Curated annotation (Swiss-Prot):
It is found in: Mitochondrion inner membrane. Cu cation A1 binds at residues 161, 196, 200, 207. Component of the cytochrome c oxidase (complex IV, CIV), a multisubunit enzyme composed of a catalytic core of 3 subunits and several supernumerary subunits. The complex exists as a monomer or a dimer and forms supercomplexes (SCs) in the inner mitochondrial membrane with ubiquinol-cytochrome c oxidoreductase (cytochrome b-c1 complex, complex III, CIII). It comes from Schistocerca gregaria (Desert locust). Its cofactor is Cu cation. This is Cytochrome c oxidase subunit 2.
């Protein structure tokens, strides 16, 4: 989750989010390099009192400033297309959960395990424990095993919502009358927080999501208590 004074993106907890982080870092360096080069060229021409007569008409320079951006865009686009493919790639998931967005809480269904169902509401500030997170904790956490491919089926019962967990690189629109899906794999244990990412009314800011990544044994024990 995002922590105090952290100005960067969250640490990835899934292979997909790690790839997105690498993509962000690489292309941030490209953007900084372009900014420095263009800024230096503009400053040099602005404060230079001399005129190069050979530069008054487009010759070699026009070819250069057309070819270099084109090559740069190609190197940026290729990793981006690969990530877009991975984001939409659908694999054979071992566990499927259903999330239904409602005003203003989430409903979950584990239909693979005798229809385990529950609702999650934000924990009020007066009910938080000492180690709780304000506006992020819920009364029922969503427990999932790590190192397991999980498929999320998302819909809504009233208005548009969006099920988003940044640390997992997942953002799925919840649309009434439609069923959207996404997949992810958590590669480490922990608590991963998210929120509704589509403005859905007065209490839009109070629809947190909490995913608890555990071992398979602890997940089975939790399921046995829920059934």
């Amino acid at each position: 989750m995002a922590t105090w004074s952290n100005l960067s993106i969250q640490d990835g907890a899934s292979p997909l989010m790690e790839q997105l982080s690498f993509f962000h870092d690489d292309h941030t360096m490209v953007v900084l390099l372009i900014t420095v080069i263009v800024g230096y060229a503009l400053s040099y021409m602005l404060f230079n009192a001399y005129t190069n007569r050979n530069m008054l008409h487009g010759h070699l320079i026009e070819t250069i400033w057309t070819a270099l951006p084109a090559i740069t865009l190609i190197f940026i686009a290729l990793p981006s297309l690969r990530l877009l493919y991975l984001l939409d790639d659908s694999v054979d998931a071992m566990i499927t959960i259903k999330t239904i967005g409602r005003q203003w809480y989430w409903s979950y269904e584990y239909s693979d395990f005798m229809d385990v169902e529950f609702d999650t509401y934000m924990t009020p500030e007066q009910d938080l424990e000492n180690d709780g997170f304000r506006l992020l904790d819920v009364d029922n956490r969503t427990i999932l095993p790590m190192n397991t491919e999980v498929r999320v089926l998302t819909s809504a019962s009233d208005v548009l919502h969006s099920w988003a967990v940044p640390a997992l690189g997942v953002k799925i629109d919840a649309t009434p009358g439609r069923l959207n899906q996404g997949t992810f794999t958590m590669n480490r244990p922990g608590l991963f927080f998210g929120q509704c990412s589509e403005i859905c009314g007065a209490n839009h800011s109070f629809m947190p999501i909490v995913i608890e990544s555990t071992s398979v044994n602890l997940f089975i024990k939790w399921l046995s208590k829920m059934i």
